[in-house]
Regions:
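Short beta-strand/loop segment that forms part of the nucleotide-sugar
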Residues: 53-63, 85-86
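Acceptor/aglycone-binding surface of glycosyltransferases and processive sugar-polymer synthases
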Residues: 85-103, 108, 120-199, 203, ...
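Hydrophobic targeting segments
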Residues: 22-28, 37, 44, 55-60
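Short, well-formed alpha-helical segments that are part of the catalytic scaffolds
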Residues: 10-12, 33-48
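Acidic helix N-cap motif at the loop->helix transition within catalytic regions
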Residues: 35-39, 66-75
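Hydrophobic helical membrane-anchoring modules
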Residues: 2-23, 200-315
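A conserved acidic beta->alpha catalytic loop
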Residues: 61-70, 116
Length: 315
């Protein structure tokens, strides 16, 4: 597992004498959320206090340029289960979640956002589902509506990416990149090194679990309008989501991506070869040779990539 570099290592105060490990760790990334971060902390702590679960709330300030960190430090003495971690420079949502999960002391890790969009009062419900069903390794809050920015562009693009992910994993995925989820920390540890620094980290953890036959359960949730300014950039982040879906499936099952392409090229090349021979026997045009050669090369790459994956998993 990769370790964080010195420049991205978080800073936090020592907790004093060792305390019993909680059952749940909630990782809350915070970046320029001064208007509502304390309200979010209050809402999460109130919900968890009302449950029968021991917990810690890990609020990670990702080098905010406003008063987010100062407000968290002020709130820390008021909430006994709150731990505040600060980054020296902005590492991204994926870096926050990765390091937060690595530093978590709970058996169950919860990811959510601090922008008031997710119903964090339902976190105990997600935890209870995991606790009651040992066969389930992750519970995801599946949003029933899209309330984010660039809605006209985001909805069709996310639908296409989600359908591609479903096709490549042979699994129905109601919400590919929901930010509210609970999972077993021990199961997630081998996949944390795969998390990218940006928003596509949630897509990555979903595909990592599905590609390795870890059962994911989806719970319908409401999704509120975001408080404050969105950090989502449509073109850049949509491209990263699509690239990450392909990268993750290539990492775990490259035959799913490469072999269909190889078969298409070989099929078209073969049909073109037959057509060429009927039209002019013993003549093979350059484009026919290119199609057949490309198909063979891609097929060889697919088999080699699959061999590498099997060798890696067996090591």
């Amino acid at each position: 597992m990769l370790n964080p570099t010195v420049s991205e290592m978080p800073h936090f105060e020592e907790d004093g004498p060792a305390q019993p490990a909680p059952y749940v760790t909630i990782v809350l990334p915070c970046f320029n959320e001064q208007e509502h971060v304390v309200k979010e902390v209050e809402r999460i702590c109130a919900a968890m206090d009302a449950s029968n679960r021991t917990y810690e709330l890990l609020a990670v300030d990702d080098a905010s340029t406003d008063d987010t960190l100062a407000l968290l430090r002020e709130a820390e003495p008021l909430f006994p289960h709150l731990r505040v971690i600060s980054f020296g420079h902005n590492g991204g949502a994926g870096t926050v979640r990765r390091i937060g999960t690595q530093r978590a002391r709970g058996q169950i890790v919860v990811w959510t956002d601090a922008d008031m969009t997710y119903p964090n009062e339902r976190i105990p419900e997600l935890v209870d589902l995991l606790a009651a069903n040992p066969d389930i390794d992750q519970v995801v809050g599946a949003r029933t509506q899209e309330s984010g920015t660039h809605r006209l562009l985001r909805v069709p693009m996310k639908w296409l990416i989600r359908k591609l992910a479903e096709r490549l994993t042979n699994t129905r995925i109601p919400d590919l990149n929901s930010g509210l989820r609970a999972f077993r920390r021990e199961v997630s540890l081998p996949y944390l090194r795969l998390l990218p620094p940006g928003f596509s980290c949630v897509t990555t953890i979903t595909l990592a679990f599905l590609s390795n036959q870890h059962l994911i359960h989806y719970v319908p949730i409401d999704y509120a309008k975001r408080s404050g300014t969105s950090k989502f950039h449509f073109v850049r982040d949509a491209y990263r989501y699509l690239l990450q879906v392909l990268r993750m499936v290539m990492y775990f099952n490259p035959l799913k991506v490469l072999m269909p392409l190889a078969l298409w090229l070989l099929g078209i090349g073969t049909a073109k070869f037959v057509f060429d021979q009927v039209r002019e026997p013993l003549y093979i045009p350059n484009n026919t040779i290119m199609l057949l050669t490309s198909g063979l090369i891609v097929a060889a790459m697919a088999l080699l990539a699959d061999l590498i994956v099997r060798s890696r998993d067996g090591a």
